[in-house]
Swiss-Prot record:
A Pfam family the protein falls into: ASL_C2
Name listed for the protein in its UniProt record: Argininosuccinate lyase
Record keywords, A-Z: Amino-acid biosynthesis, Arginine biosynthesis, Cytoplasm, Lyase
Species name: Streptomyces coelicolor (strain ATCC BAA-471 / A3(2) / M145)
Lineage of origin: Bacteria, Bacillati, Actinomycetota, Actinomycetes, Kitasatosporales
Compartments, record wording: Cytoplasm
Catalysed reactions listed for this entry: 2-(N(omega)-L-arginino)succinate = fumarate + L-arginine
Length: 475
């Protein structure tokens, strides 16, 4: 069924000879654009209907055309029909398949009023919109895992860091919800991108539109484009900003996941011992029997570079292309296909790693006040006593200097040492030199107080539920 029955190129009438073998190999894209076949067939059904509405197909011809497309779709799905290098691309392969099933007299009528230029621009949008929902669902799953960690450890304190140095104590739940919120913005970008992409280029033809009286709005409705057809046929066939934007979103997802990954790698070291990875989501060493390696996190970190590279390569391809369609745009698909493939493998594994993480409360809380991380609390306590912050900052810094010289933490300084540093440092300063007090005091919106984190948790859960609903809407 997949053998090539003659020359079914979609062009060639003005050429005396066929393309050179080297050109055919260079031009071939069916090995990577075959994944668009179901969308191409859906587009062909919609196109057949508007041909019928325009009087270019009879009722009987439409019925037989749809039946032939249905048979072709089934054969593609079960693998009995595939493209070959001689087909050049998915569009040519499927036209060959239709001609084999319907013959040239009927099968050949489907080409009227459309070009590969508007076909591929439409099919690519359909494909990416479907996978945007798949990726969006996987992001929501990862957010669910982070929410689960926050709910399981609502009162665990840990050292918050800036520049990877101890800064201020924070709740572990506060920390993981920060990652959940970043991923939520990625999910929001997908939803916003989908709304912008819900416009059909079908009917644009090669660039100038169609003279056959076809209805592009009917095709748009048939194919699920909520915002109808494009307003400019040249823009419809030539623009790939929707591809570049999608590639950026996937790269941003990779970057955000890589930030979590880097922390897991650090936290999993013996020196930190904040977390332990589940055996099912770790690997060993071929020579060192004691090793338990965070390969998922490391692969996430590495794949983020790959996703960024796909975006960069795509942008370089699109740069300075004149209107309208150019063959350079054949190169727009593989980078984005790869980004989708990578995320759809990476995100489930990463979610599994996070969902099965063991958190070591004692170790986190041991280090939460370390590194003089309560110094800011001293300064803010002084401000509440009426001391200007500039002075309070200097006094708190002096406390750190004295404690560091004595090999102590701030809460280990004596009342006499505090009094010697500043007359404002009365024994009451000790009320803020503890982690629970430091956490509870930061109760403004977005803060690390348990009450503030509870609000964040509820908001993230609501956002994740909305994301799941959007992702599942077209399944």
């Amino acid at each position: 069924m997949s053998s090539n029955s003659g020359d079914v190129r979609l062009w060639g009438g003005r050429f005396a000879d066929g393309p050179a073998e080297a050109l055919a190999k260079l031009s071939a894209s069916v090995h990577f654009d075959w994944r668009l076949a179901p969308y191409d067939i859906a587009g062909s059904r919609a196109h057949a209907r508007v041909l019928h509405a325009a009087g270019l197909l009879t009722e009987d011809e439409l019925t037989r055309m749809i039946a032939g497309l249905d048979r072709l779709e089934a054969d593609v799905a079960d693998g009995s029909f595939t493209g070959t290098i001689a087909d050049e691309d998915v569009h040519t392969a499927l036209e060959r398949g239709l001609l084999e099933r319907l013959g040239p007299d009927l099968g050949g009528k489907l080409r009227a009023g459309r070009s590969r230029n508007d076909q591929v621009a439409t099919l690519f949008r359909m494909y990416l919109r479907d996978h945007a929902r798949t990726v969006g669902s996987l992001i929501a799953d990862l957010q669910d895992a982070l929410v689960g960690l926050a709910e399981a450890h609502p009162d665990v304190a840990m050292p918050g860091r800036t520049h990877l140095q101890h800064a201020q104590p924070v709740l572990f739940a506060h920390h993981v919800l920060a990652h959940a919120q970043a991923l939520g913005r990625d999910a929001e970008r997908l939803r916003q991108w989908d709304a912008r992409t819900a416009v059909s280029p079908y009917g644009s033809g090669a660039l100038a539109g169609s003279s056959l009286g076809l209805d592009p709005e009917a095709v748009a409705r048939d194919l699920g484009f909520e915002h109808g057809s494009v307003g400019n046929s040249i823009d419809g066939t030539a623009s790939r900003d929707f591809v570049a934007e999608f590639a950026f979103i996937t790269a941003m997802i990779g970057v955000n996941v890589s930030r979590i990954a880097e922390e897991i790698i650090i936290w999993n070291t013996k020196e930190f011992s904040f977390v332990t990875l589940h055996d099912a989501f770790s690997t060993g060493s071929s020579i060192m029997p004691q090793k338990k390696n965070p390969d998922i996190a490391e692969l996430a970190r590495g794949k983020s570079g790959r996703l960024i590279g796909n975006l960069t390569g795509l942008m370089a391809t699109l740069k300075a292309l004149p209107l309208a369609y150019n063959r350079d745009l054949q190169e727009d698909k593989e980078p984005v296909f790869d980004s989708i493939d990578q995320l759809e493998v990476l995100l489930p594994a990463f979610t599994g790693m996070m969902a099965t993480l063991t958190v070591h409360r004692e170790r986190m809380e041991e280090l939460a006040p370390a590194g003089f991380s309560l110094a800011t609390d001293i300064a803010e306590w002084l401000v509440k006593q009426g001391v200007p912050f500039r002075v309070a900052h200097e006094v708190a810094g002096e406390c750190v200097k004295v404690a560091e010289a004595d090999g102590k933490e701030l809460d280990e300084l004596t009342d006499e040492q505090f009094a010697k540093i500043s007359e404002h440092l009365t024994p009451e300063v000790r009320t803020v030199l503890n982690v629970p007090g430091a956490l509870a005091s930061r109760d403004g919106r977005g803060g690390t107080a348990p009450s503030a984190v509870a609000v964040q948790l509820a908001e993230v859960k609501a956002d994740v539920a909305a994301q799941h609903a959007w992702a599942d809407a077209k399944k």
